[in-house]
Amino acid sequence: MENKNEKVEKFIQIGELAKKARVTPRTIKHYEDKGLLKPFKKTQGGFRLYQDDKVKLVERIRQLKKAGFSLREVKEMEEIDGIVEENIFEKVDDNELNKMIKFLQSQLIKTEERLNETIKVKKGLEEVIEFLKKRKRT
């Protein structure tokens, strides 16, 4: 009889991970090269196998890239996130915590600056649209 409390881990290959996360397999390999992602294991045939939950990680990386963060910044944020999720603060001294806080505060400032620039662009587009609508003959 099967134990209902046991979690059966599902593994997916690089193509399926890429498809689910809406990126290319080449992007997945690039993230691996940058240390952002690694396969759970490789088969004897050399196929990379990933845990199904890596889809969310790839989507988060893509989202942060789209928001203007470099892969280096994304990696640092993911490392901090891992410490928070695993609650392993006993392995981190106050000096390291201060570095993390400073880094995240600088990322927050950059995000606010990008957001303000995006709002300005949006307002400019809205003004041009309204101007053009007023010029229509019909």
Regions found by a protein language model. Name each.
Residues 28, 32, 65:
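DNA major-groove recognition helix of helix-turn-helix
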